[in-house]
Amino acid sequence: EGQVVLLCGEAGIGKSRLVRHLRDQLMGEHYETLQYQCSPHRTNTVLYPVVTYLRQVAGLADEDSASMQQQKLATLMADNGFDDRITIALFADLLSIQGHDQDQLANVSPDKCKDMTLEALVQYLHRLADRSPALLIVEDAHWLDPTTLDLMTRVIDRIRQMRLLVLITFRPDFRPVWAEYSHVTFLTLNRLPRRQSAELIATMTGGKVLPQEVQQAILAKTDGVPLYIEELMESLLETGLLAEGIDSFALKAPLKDMVIPDSLQALLMERVDRLGPVKEIAQIGAAIGREFTYELLRATVEITDSQLN
């Protein structure tokens, strides 16, 4: 029967890395994967992560003609056993595909249309899981729009009848209503203790010893946040503030001259600032989203292929 795992942790604590590790562990297994990626810029966009997933799995592109989009939708529906005109019209409306039996919904109220759409999406997951076990990953659920939150509640309420594992990641300020369900497991990722933080630093330096004062400054500033430790170490190694020896590093200047950003966000911005001409590309990529194709980036930036490569 289906299960749900809720994975809670602050930014940079390792939620996404744990998700990647799970997928690596399942490599070679026969299962379907779905990913709903939430966005801080789309918290009020109805079903944004679901629409993004469906457009990707259907292969829809902005430059597709209306007939091409209709054809791709028909293939997606047929692959998942949907042949009734109303359900196909619901998906067409959700994906903003024009001219595909829209008259089927002409007399349906907005509230009824929303309810029917959510039920169709639950059935989509059910049929997918009927073919093979499925993994649904919902990343950054603290940015879920209300309608997708409603959808997830419906899925979790019925998941015991599906061969489906739902993994939901979120930050501590999100309070999932499903935490007390018997088929839901709640996990919290905490900050690393100093010993494990030191082990992570040693991994980053290839086992070479840092000056004690530098190591203590890193441990104090990062306070056990793994991504902060990794990014700060990368920054120190990139900027040449440390001289590398055979089995250790040495400071090139007094520690007081080293400026260590006060937060992970400030550190990341500092590293972006050092990218030079690549900075604008990185910023455009960040504005697009966590994942994007080369073609989309190429169409967005005003440089040549050779420069982008």
Residue ranges of predicted features:
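Short hydrophobic/aromatic beta-strand immediately N-terminal to the Walker A/P-loop
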Residues: 4-8, 35, 135-137
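P-loop NTPase Walker A phosphate-binding motif
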Residues: 13-44, 48, 52, 60
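Short secondary-structure boundary elements
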Residues: 1, 6-13, 18-22, 50-53, ...
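A short beta-strand-to-loop transition that corresponds to the Sensor-1 phosphate-sensing loop
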Residues: 37-40, 168-173, 232-236
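Sensor-1/coupling segment of RecA-like P-loop NTPase cores
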Residues: 151-188
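Conserved Walker-type P-loop NTP-binding/catalytic site
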Residues: 46-135, 163, 179-182, 187, ...
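A short hydrophobic beta-strand->loop->alpha-helix junction that borders the nucleotide-binding pocket
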Residues: 8, 34-43, 76, 189-190
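Conserved Walker B catalytic segment
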Residues: 126-166, 298, 306-307
